[in-house]
């Protein structure tokens, strides 16, 4: 049947790795990515395992690299990514790597420390420069006679009368601009208005030496009288984290200090530039090798983590590991082990030994870039049980098709297809860019799903003859109104009737079915919705029942593969009979009615709903209701009886037969004596010698039969299946409902937006149409493509997860997670 339709055959293998070759062998297995290691030390603490020191050393190197990476990104230097997959370094190379990383880290920390000190000094000098400049302006203003009255308010009137010469003290400093209002109010309240504050903003933002952020600050100068106020002012400045600087009192001293400060700033700026150039050179050199270093260190860390899962034999010369691996890849695994042994220089080969086990292997489905997205849709609901039918190959067709039934629009399908084609054509470039946007990454990983959804939507849009809510007249309508004017429509009828009906029984009115899809004339009909609703509702029922019957049919493939004939006779056959006799018969009735009744006999066509209800009620007394075909009553009674028989068939027989088999095995049971199993069977050849570990393994995992649990389980399954056939069939009506909703939304959008623009007859209509079309395009993409597309996607997903897969899919397995370096060299370090 092909491995595409089932998960890969897996085996449990035991690896015997020589201590000196274990590192290289695990490295080769990581490059291969085909084995899943089992933890053989589940009871051993992580910090007590053999290679914990090596793991810690790798984590320390990883920490240093993250520090370097942070500094590189802070400097806006791009990390070189050539796509190279470097080889794993040997254990002896870890010392050189540690020394190299230690050197880079120490050098960067020294540079950062020196640079921070220089920047702090530069900030202080810059603030002092602005203080000297602004305070000079303050003192110049204070020397203005017009300001004398304002400045004298600090003096008591009695002191002014005595004319005593008083000296005002002052402090100058710099504070964050946003703290000025609070700072000013605090000074006023604490000093009770006995201080004079002047402040001016520094136009250029200053750089914080610690964070590197730009900070807006202001210069202030505070005048006061007395030591008590001076102490209060300094405490307030300290509380608001204001920086105070000494400011000379005379203009000459301030000028000399400003000259010295400017000279020191120029010298400091030169040193800062040289320091930054040196830092840039160090970071640029590190950025060239940073990705390679990350990959090497994290590969080493992954190897040592894996080695900690292994057991060590009593001689301390060999490591024992257990791995799950695909049977088809055993040769490549053997070759990888030989290659690792050769690289290590060991003369003793590593051994791979297949083991017999009753444990359920992990599920491994091989995928490529096309099937990857569809397999993820399957696995999102539940990982398939080992070797059961994989729904992904069928989902490749059925999922986009059911989506398109709900989304069918030729125009919208074309837009979706173009978007998917763009992603497919540019996939190599997009992959190389490593885009971090989660939403786009999710859509890109499902690009082939979107492509098929767009193609199928284009097809169903042609079937519905719907393109942005408008019909396409590709072949010309098969309906003609001309013959109706000859005899049927009178002048009086035309004058007094607003809605006219075309009679297909009149010769020449209807010339046969439209070549492909729905006739475009229906887009003009007032009973368009009535016709489309009937068509889409029946189509949804037909597609849904066929989909479910296909799911039931797939279950027999599982029963055959797992050699469970009891499930074929007691589950598959009654389930198929129940489904086909009731709902398969309904599909046949729908198709039969389409074929048996034409335009001439449509007036006497019976209602399928009434016939289907009467079928379950065995009600055939109403002679006014014509039969669909001869012998209908007998056939329908037979089908209902067959369906009723299937219920006890599924409910009762299987538990009874399982109980009988259990009692028979118990009567012919076996007993273990040491390493020998002796049976009470009809022949003495049934005794076989079995290894003790195999006996204990089998006996531990052998399940005890419980008749009560079996009856309850079978009752639940039977009730769920019988009721599910009804509810699941009704659930497929969502195909009709969402298709109708999509068509109506598309029509409303055209009528309310685009139609208005096309009806503008003035000269400005062309200009207005540009803006109206922009709004129409935006709403089409946002509402009809994204929102409606997501809605149809989720409904199609539900139909596959519930209505389709519950017929055959167990989904109780666990995923095969091989030890692989792929996620590391692809840049997904956190994985």
UniProtKB/Swiss-Prot annotation:
Transmembrane segments: 389-407, 410-426, 442-471, 535-554, 573-593, 639-658, 719-743, 765-803
GO cellular component terms given for this protein: clathrin-coated vesicle membrane; melanosome; plasma membrane; synaptic vesicle membrane; vacuolar proton-transporting V-type ATPase complex; vacuolar proton-transporting V-type ATPase, V0 domain
Transport found in the keyword field: yes
Sequence similarity: Belongs to the V-ATPase 116 kDa subunit family.
Vacuolar compartment spans: 408-409, 472-534, 594-638, 744-764
Domain of life: Eukaryota
Localisation per UniProt entry: Cytoplasmic vesicle, Clathrin-coated vesicle membrane; Cytoplasmic vesicle, Secretory vesicle, Synaptic vesicle membrane; Melanosome
Membrane topology designation: Multi-pass membrane protein
Keywords: Cytoplasmic vesicle, Hydrogen ion transport, Ion transport, Membrane, Synapse, Transmembrane, Transmembrane helix, Transport
Subunit text: V-ATPase is a heteromultimeric enzyme made up of two complexes: the ATP-hydrolytic V1 complex and the proton translocation V0 complex. The V1 complex consists of three catalytic AB heterodimers that form a heterohexamer, three peripheral stalks each consisting of EG heterodimers, one central rotor including subunits D and F, and the regulatory subunits C and H. The proton translocation complex V0 consists of the proton transport subunit a, a ring of proteolipid subunits c9c'', rotary subunit d, subunits e and f, and two accessory subunits.
GO biological process, one term: vacuolar acidification
Function: Subunit of the V0 complex of vacuolar(H+)-ATPase (V-ATPase), a multisubunit enzyme composed of a peripheral complex (V1) that hydrolyzes ATP and a membrane integral complex (V0) that translocates protons. V-ATPase is responsible for acidifying and maintaining the pH of intracellular compartments and in some cell types, is targeted to the plasma membrane, where it is responsible for acidifying the extracellular environment. Required for assembly and activity of the vacuolar ATPase.
Presence of keyword Membrane: yes
Gene that encodes it: atp6v0a1
Chief place where the protein resides: membrane
Example of a GO MF term: ATPase binding
Listed name of the protein: V-type proton ATPase 116 kDa subunit a1
Cytoplasmic side: 1-388, 427-441, 555-572, 659-718, 804-831
